């Protein structure tokens, strides 16, 4: 008897289209924009918001350029999670045996920003809301792509904020914050963002 597919397996299947996330980055971004999520127990094969966010995190590295001196060529390319981890095994499954320009992709869970300098992408969890300003201040102008679902994340200096719109996971971008850290976001990524802030934080709040 065939076993019921686990959620982490579902995000790779043709049934959901998430397999595009591993082989066709541009197609994956377009697909992720169209995926609706459901809370019904009958929709087991449909990715959850966290599954979709994990797929975005996995694909962001294909649309962002880091400074050449931001890490050793032989060091792993680290996607880090600070605080509450809502991804379970979804992110681990997506990056298994994957590389970025010859560097092995790894997932790291952090309890503070003290070791975040070794990360290339940092997802800041909900549990960090009260420490958000401090967390982002510690990473200011460092080549770490910061991502979160926290409210007002971009206003605090974060770079990419996930949003839920009409049961779909979308994202907004704070371009100056990324540029000040030496990161270059591709035009393909910016085109599919809900909004792109092009003003530095001090100007945007005037």
Which stretches of residues belong to each language-model region?
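Short hydrophobic alpha-helices and adjacent helix-cap/hinge residues
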Residues: 2-6, 17-28, 36-206
